[in-house]
């Protein structure tokens, strides 16, 4: 998933949600764009690399809803 959304050649990248936390290709979490709670699936199209804090804070929210509610800079990744 890292390679698809960030690129195999990149070793670090900012979180897709907060756009602040630096993640490493070896240390990141997987967040659902559409939450499992809302019948989101485990396909690569529905998953994004995000930081631990965003993943835990998001809970069962959909990713875009979480980003908008928290007024996070990561919204640019979804427009």
Regions found by a protein language model. Give the residues of each.
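Short, charged surface segments at domain edges that flank catalytic/cofactor-binding sites
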Residues: 1-17, 74-78
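Short, cysteine/histidine-rich loop/knuckle motifs that typically chelate Zn2+
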Residues: 16-19, 53
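A generic secondary-structure signal for well-formed alpha-helical elements
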Residues: 54-58, 74
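Short coil/turn linker and secondary-structure boundary residues
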Residues: 13, 58-61
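Histidine-centered nuclease catalytic patch
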Residues: 19-49, 60-65, 69-70
